[in-house]
Design a protein with these regions (language model features):
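Sec-dependent signal peptide recognition
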Residues: 2-8
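Residue-level detector of intrinsically disordered/flexible regions characterized by low predicted structural confidence
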Residues: 4, 264-265
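Residues that line or immediately flank small-molecule/substrate-binding pockets and catalytic motifs
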Residues: 8, 32, 94
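A periodicity- and composition-biased signal for non-globular, repetitive helical segments
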Residues: 8-9, 146
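Hydrophobic h-region of N-terminal signal peptides that target proteins for export
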Residues: 9-17
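Alpha-helical transmembrane segments and their juxtamembrane interfaces
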Residues: 12-13, 43, 166, 247
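Serine-esterase "nucleophile elbow" of acetyl-processing enzymes
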Residues: 17-65, 70, 76-86, 90, ...
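Alpha-helical cap/lid subdomain in secreted, periplasmic
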Residues: 54, 75-264
Length: 265
């Protein structure tokens, strides 16, 4: 009996070890802000560098410091000019600067009464349409996802929520309070995170909730090993990036990357 059990466990372990990560050897585009920006070097690797090493993938990184949702299509245009559609997936990691800038949350939809054929009878029904408005947070997200899903209908698109925010000072006129404070339009960071979760459902794009799952909580000094410290408790350091990358790596195990594959390995 013990031999049979040992054999079963061995077979299970061999099966698990034989499963290849679905994102292995992939070509991944990264849009985002300073945490993604390849021009802002951390004392080590960025999260996408870790993922590139672990997955043997090719990263195409277009994130720029300070960017908000309304600037993502500009990053997409640069990508298109450089690599066209020669990639497998897009990750979008942005939103924290929209919160810091006090961008209003806004609405997802507008509604209007229209006449429509229902079972052969013309009736009046209320119809909703996405708000496409760069002056609001949800409007910005709608614009980006509407465009990307139309332009790249066969590509995987993954949203990453912003992580928690602690105090940062990058100059006398660039002081950013921690997330326990409302922003200029009276919203907490939570509202911006929740909107990205909602966008996942509205636009049928998966979301990796780093705000909840990464474990990073720089408001506690005990987690100082994950941030540069001093005047910057906002950006993760190399160890913070590694922890984010670990979370993303394991979440990606549940998501397909190449959507043109006919049968999983």
């Amino acid at each position: 009996m013990k031999r049979i059990l040992a054999l079963v466990l061995l077979l299970i372990s061999l099966t698990v070890s034989a499963v290849e990560h679905p994102w292995k050897s992939s070509r991944v585009v990264y849009f985002g802000d300073s945490i993604t920006d390849p021009g802002l070097k951390v004392s080590g690797k960025n999260y996408w560098s870790y993922l590139s090493d672990w997955l043997e993938s090719t990263p195409y990184v277009y994130g720029r410091s300070g960017h908000q949702w309304h600037q993502i299509l500009g990053q997409a245009e640069r990508m298109k000019n450089q690599i066209g559609d020669n990639f497998d997936a897009i990750m979008i990691f942005v939103g924290t600067n929209d919160y810091n800038a006090g961008v209003k949350i806004g609405e997802w939809f507008t509604e209007e009464t229209v006449t429509v054929n229902a079972d052969g009878v013309m009736v009046e029904r209320v119809r909703r349409s996405p708000v496409l408005d760069n002056s609001t947070y949800r409007g910005r997200i709608n614009i980006v996802l509407d465009s990307l899903k139309r332009t790249y209908p066969t590509k995987q698109i993954v949203l990453l929520t912003p992580i928690h925010r602690a105090y940062a000072k990058f100059g006398e006129r660039n002081v950013q309070p921690d997330e326990s404070h409302q922003n200029a339009c009276g919203e907490y960071l939570d509202a911006y995170i929740e909107s990205i979760r909602e966008a996942s459902s509205i636009w049928s794009v998966p979301v990796i909730d780093l705000y909840s799952l990464s474990g990073l909580y720089p408001l506690h000094k005990e987690q100082g090993m994950y941030v540069p410290g001093g005047n910057d408790n906002l950006h993760p350091n190399a160890e913070g990036h590694r922890r984010m990358a670990l979370c993303i790596y394991y979440q990606l195990l549940a998501l397909p990357c190449r959507l043109d594959v006919q049968k999983p390995a």
